[in-house]
């Protein structure tokens, strides 16, 4: 399974793509002036067409190698995106080399991936927290009965962690560091395990390296 974040790093002078995926994410939030690391998907939809195309093209090349066969592609999208946004995703995949592109709503894909029998008449509630959107849906008989998509998800959690660390400790951390904090000690409810997680960053006042320790009580919703 190929697992790559939707991040690109490019030269700010000529817009040339330097790296994609994990390599680009490593420098997200801490790039020198001539390199820009960005996420071309905003709230689960295409915000930068060219960069989105580059990401899809990169993933296809990494998966298929130098194959001359144009693949069929299935892409997950938020459940409430517009027809215009759907067409933008399909066009980006087409320009990247896909022969046919099919879209599936993220809650339905999450249910299938979790082993839920989506064809069952009994309804199942699925909450899919992605990077840009959180989708909540009731799934029954192979489809979505009712759903709601909100533009608050993992990316916003990371931003809130960055803001918290900067406000409380006068320390600046990058998006990748904030995500690691979220994964390791983030919790909807404070845990009582007493686990502490070390965060390394840069002092906001003097610019020197520093570190702090936080617990799930600090990072809980």
Stretches found by the model and what they are:
Residues 1-129, 137-221:
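Nucleotide/phosphate-binding catalytic cleft detector across ATP-hydrolyzing
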Residues 132:
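Conserved Rossmann-like nucleotide-cofactor binding loop
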């Amino acid at each position: 399974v190929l697992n790559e974040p939707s991040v690109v790093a490019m030269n700010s002078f000529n817009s040339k793509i330097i790296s994609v995926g994990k390599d680009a994410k490593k420098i997200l939030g801490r790039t020198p002036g001539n390199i820009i690391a960005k996420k071309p998907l905003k709230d689960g939809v295409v915000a930068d067409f060219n960069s989105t195309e580059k990401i899809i093209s990169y993933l296809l090349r990494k998966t298929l190698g130098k194959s001359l066969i144009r693949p069929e592609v299935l892409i997950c999208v938020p459940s409430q995106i517009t027809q215009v946004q759907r067409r933008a995703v399909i066009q980006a995949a087409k320009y990247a080399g896909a022969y046919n592109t099919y879209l599936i709503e993220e809650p339905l894909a999450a249910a299938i991936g979790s082993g839920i029998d989506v064809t069952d008449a009994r309804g199942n509630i699925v909450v899919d927290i992605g990077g840009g959107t959180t989708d909540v849906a009731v799934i029954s008989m192979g489809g979505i009965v009712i759903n709601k998509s909100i533009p608050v998800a993992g990316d916003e959690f990371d931003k809130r962690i960055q803001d918290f660390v900067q406000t409380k400790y006068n320390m600046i951390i990058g998006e990748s560091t904030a995500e690691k904090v979220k994964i390791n000690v983030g919790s909807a409810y404070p845990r009582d395990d007493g686990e502490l997680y070390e965060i390394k960053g840069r002092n906001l006042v003097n610019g020197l390296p520093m570190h702090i320790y936080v617990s799930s009580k600090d990072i809980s919703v």
